[in-house]
Amino acid sequence: MEINATTLWRDILAVRTKAPLVHNITNYVVMNSTANALLSIGASPVMAHAEEEVIDMVTIAGSLVINIGTLSKAWVAAMHKAMKKAHELQKPIVFDPVGAGATPYRTQTILELIHETPPSIIRGNSSEIKALVEAGIKTKGVDSTESSESAIEAAKHLSQKYGAVICISGATDHILNQEEYVRVENGHPMMTKVTGLGCTATAVVAAFAAINPSMMEATAHGMAAMGIAGEIAAKNVAGPGSLQVNFLDTLYSLSEADVHSHLKICA
Amino acid sequence: MEINATTLWRDILAVRTKAPLVHNITNYVVMNSTANALLSIGASPVMAHAEEEVIDMVTIAGSLVINIGTLSKAWVAAMHKAMKKAHELQKPIVFDPVGAGATPYRTQTILELIHETPPSIIRGNSSEIKALVEAGIKTKGVDSTESSESAIEAAKHLSQKYGAVICISGATDHILNQEEYVRVENGHPMMTKVTGLGCTATAVVAAFAAINPSMMEATAHGMAAMGIAGEIAAKNVAGPGSLQVNFLDTLYSLSEADVHSHLKICA
Amino acid sequence: MEINATTLWRDILAVRTKAPLVHNITNYVVMNSTANALLSIGASPVMAHAEEEVIDMVTIAGSLVINIGTLSKAWVAAMHKAMKKAHELQKPIVFDPVGAGATPYRTQTILELIHETPPSIIRGNSSEIKALVEAGIKTKGVDSTESSESAIEAAKHLSQKYGAVICISGATDHILNQEEYVRVENGHPMMTKVTGLGCTATAVVAAFAAINPSMMEATAHGMAAMGIAGEIAAKNVAGPGSLQVNFLDTLYSLSEADVHSHLKICA
């Protein structure tokens, strides 16, 4: 594992050059903003959830995003199918357990999905990561109220159980698997006031996972690109509305100098 | 009932401090923009519509938004469930009858929903409010073509029948229950060129309803906050695109001085 | 057929004055941005997909958009119903075959829909247009990787088979029916980095089709309005985020002078 400004910039260029197709089965709230972020970073997004086509779609994709933000029965069936096929084809599956712990249905559905087909990467906030390990944890909706540090033990447990890279996002992003650990310190507090930037991070990680076989590197690179773009975009903005606009502009125009001067990573 | 710049500012601070969880069962068009507006005003949005989880979700929420903009069968069943549970737990239900009168299915579905569980607050434009009272009224899609004044009699009737606060939004917002009446004169004509700002108003009202037990005060405060933010945001914008961005920035940064200098209310 | 800056400006004014109701059965990703573009150009958008109401909705609409971007069974049934009713009432149907060729389900569903009820206009990128003619064509997701020229033969074939106007959009837009051919050269490369601007073009064409009985003129006017607005909007933007915002502002404020100085059409 090698993660630094040079490897990050190399992988940003690879995403821009290869424009990997990222297949998203994601929630209604973030479909538009996620697609725009994927286009801005240089990937090619597709959103498709019909049971009749998810297998064919994941077959031509470079990676698969599963985000359970606005669940319902038919979609869960499609998620199972797409995950199985991605696993069979050894394509990265990046899983976002939005609101885990908020309702029993949500937590149980997630556990069934990841138990049947272990994802390559799971990215959530601390409440969500903890809810997947401790039954009955109290979650307040979809926004986390706890520090990301508090979920590190739960993340280690999850990683061991599913063999996945776990990313706890927050002021600090903690990324780990069974042997390795990376901390990304980029980002800006106002990012929590733009809906779905967590979901966007998951999708951006999937773009990097489509072009780099190391899931640790892909996760760290994706989270760092998000954090750096958010940090630069937040300079001199008047609020979350302009942050969202600047964020896409910044992702699109991220330069080697931006990466080298802003990356705060501890590998 | 007391509604003035001081009470409005007090309640804006309360929303920012308490960050109430607002559970939205709303339409696809506005999910993203509504969630962003709720975050900007300081609330915590959650969108969830699965029959399997709406009861649990509304149980942890501070208020419930029901918006029938993009109806279908499964969603209506979830709306019924969520409304019943909210009523049982005495949590405010804010109802948005989008496009009432446009099709018989829409009008009938709304009437069934509010007949079974009367909402705390109903917010619509004049065509929608009238369509809920007069059968066969001619509605042109989801945008109103009539003045808000023309629906006051219908609103009084609705309020009596369901015991709800009714808000007719438009150039002037008329807010009434069986005993009280308030008029809010804030806002800007260009707001009608941004999709879903009516739906957003409903959700913002729900944020205030989660922290103030007076539904009249909550409705007036929510509509006034929307109108003031829209008015300030519309200054010097080039069109609806920048209005939408500035609107979120302004909601986020609304100050005591903004409230005192802009509020145009007649209580 | 007459298509030039004078006729384009005349039809922009007609859309602004008549504010035609455009009924969209479209995909989740673009609902918000499409509705905003329709409002900015001066039309009145409505999104409705319930089988129980699509017939009533299309009856009061000026035109119908069918966009299969995020397909599923229940929606396809509603599309069939709405298309049949629109055809019966002689209202323009504008069809967007998003991602045709990406999966067999997608291609087959499109062919079934347009075989049962031929649309008035089909707008797609070159891969999509070709996929509707040549079985087994290789499509990479929803973004086209080929020039629009390469699909002209396929477009002619489609036009003959279904009696529809075909628009192949790209750097150059090719618009044709069995007798006529128009080329629109407006637009900007960065428009491909904003999600759903193709879908938006389809909806804007539907706004023009609601006020001009010539489907060739409506398509050319719609595509030209999109291209001119995109071109003006792209001046001095920092990236796709601000392009999206400027694009709406520009559509809203498009002037006679803008149209006359920018239109690049070959009729």
UniProtKB/Swiss-Prot annotation, chains A, B, C:
Amino acids binding substrate: M47, G196
Source superkingdom: Bacteria
Cofactor: Mg(2+)
A Pfam family matched in the record: HK
UniProt GO BP: thiamine biosynthetic process; thiamine diphosphate biosynthetic process
Key word Disulfide bond present: no
EC class: transferase
Pathway entry: Cofactor biosynthesis; thiamine diphosphate biosynthesis; 4-methyl-5-(2-phosphoethyl)-thiazole from 5-(2-hydroxyethyl)-4-methylthiazole: step 1/1
Keywords: ATP-binding, Kinase, Magnesium, Metal-binding, Nucleotide-binding, Thiamine biosynthesis, Transferase
Catalytic activity: 5-(2-hydroxyethyl)-4-methylthiazole + ATP = 4-methyl-5-(2-phosphooxyethyl)-thiazole + ADP + H(+)
MF term (GO), any: hydroxyethylthiazole kinase activity
E.C. code: 2.7.1.50
Binding of ATP, residues: R123, S169
Transmembrane feature ranges: none
HAMAP family: Thz_kinase
Function statement: Catalyzes the phosphorylation of the hydroxyl group of 4-methyl-5-beta-hydroxyethylthiazole (THZ).
Family: Belongs to the Thz kinase family.
The protein's name in its UniProt record: Hydroxyethylthiazole kinase
Native organism: Chloroherpeton thalassium (strain ATCC 35110 / GB-78)
Upper classification of the organism: Bacteria, Pseudomonadati, Chlorobiota, Chlorobiia, Chlorobiales
